[in-house]
């Protein structure tokens, strides 16, 4: 028997109800983000065409995302992305999700940066701190001679950081190290 085609409005309702039942605090917002993530539909498009049919494949993907979020998996681990300092960063279960309050640290670091300085980001995770400092210094202050090192004990975290560096076009030396064990003295 063929499954009934669901509309954007119906899918969103299914998502909000399920997340609310499971005690997700921002159930409405999370259901919306996941709908947008899966379908690519903007809020303007949603409100213009709430009865637009959603493909069976996208409906299944959305329901799977809702199930994962209902199991309290962080939204960013489901979408694989978190914005930090205005840049998109890949994230997964091997790294901490970049937090907006950490942006203050980056903003303060940028204020003290001078040409030819080196930045060491210990326990780098996604690399968001070192990458944001270097990228913003390049774009805002034209400091292209800065060097960055991102160190982490986890090779899985370093894979994420390398991908973020590649996506942002920022060269950083990535080192697998338990704190300072393999950090060169300079």
Region annotations inferred by a language model:
Residues 36-111:
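Conserved AdoMet
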Residues 19-23, 39, 70, 113, ...:
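Secondary-structure transition/hinge residues
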Residues 103-186:
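Conserved SAM/SAH cofactor-binding pocket of Class I
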Residues 2-54, 58, 62:
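A short N-terminal interaction module
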Residues 6, 29, 57, 97-100, ...:
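Residues at secondary-structure transition points
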Residues 23, 27, 42-43, 74, ...:
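Secondary-structure boundary/capping signal
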């Amino acid at each position: 028997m063929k499954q009934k085609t669901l509309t954007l409005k119906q899918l969103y309702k299914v998502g909000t109800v399920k997340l609310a039942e499971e005690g997700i605090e921002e159930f409405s917002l999370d259901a919306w983000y996941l709908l947008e993530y899966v379908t690519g539909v903007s809020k303007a498009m949603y409100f213009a065409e709430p009865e637009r049919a959603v493909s069976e494949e996208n409906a299944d993907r959305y329901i799977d995302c809702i199930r994962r979020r209902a199991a309290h998996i962080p939204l960013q681990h489901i979408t694989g992305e978190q914005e930090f300092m205005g840049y998109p960063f890949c994230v997964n279960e091997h790294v901490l999700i970049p937090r907006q309050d950490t942006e203050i640290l980056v903003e303060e670091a940028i204020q003290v940066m001078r040409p030819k300085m080196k930045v060491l980001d210990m326990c780098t995770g996604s690399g968001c701190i070192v990458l944001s400092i270097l990228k913003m210094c390049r774009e805002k202050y034209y400091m292209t001679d800065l060097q960055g090192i991102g160190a982490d004990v986890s090779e899985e975290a370093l894979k994420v950081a390398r991908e973020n560096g590649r996506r942002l076009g920022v060269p950083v030396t990535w080192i697998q190290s338990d704190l300072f064990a393999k950090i060169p003295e300079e």
